[in-house]
Amino acid sequence: AGKIALKIYPQILTELSKEVRKGIFVVCGTNGKTTTNNMLCAALEAEGQKVVCNHTGSNMLNGVVAAFALGAGLNGHIDADYACIEVDEASTRHIFPRMKPNYMVMTNLFRDQLDRYGEIDITMNILEEMIRTVPDMKLIVNGDDALSAYMAMDSGNPCVYYGISRPVMRNETNEIREGRFCKKCGER
């Protein structure tokens, strides 16, 4: 649906996203994007808000456009208080020029995108560049993830942090933990 909508009307995402009344949330990160996005949507709907959401995790440009196009009524307009949109980190380059989010939720940043992007630093650079294009966007960041927290602190955007207040488990594992050390201070 998104690919066809973009062919017919290339500005569709820009136009429909402007009709969201209260705010647009984007959810990015390596793990938990779909779950976080759907929980956020459910919380807003439980408060009586009307929400556009890409529930199935179609998180690249065509999927985001499809969520908005399918959320439009027969009159071609969105009737939504909020939008909760899961976005693939690299796809922010295609989505942010068309849609200006009010909030970005960052779950974490790990090496899973290695097959697509080569290095975690490439993913971080893409996100940092796109965050700079929306200086008013409030970042809602997993403070327990050193890479996400560093990126938020370095961005200059307003931000709030969430996480676990104390360590639940301190057992060491053999898994690669590239986000284990802070890029700013080197601490765990």
Q: Where on the chain are the PLM-derived regions?
A:
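Short, cysteine/histidine-rich loop/knuckle motifs that typically chelate Zn2+
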Residues: 183-187
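Phosphate-binding loop of NTP-binding sites
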Residues: 1-163, 167, 171-181
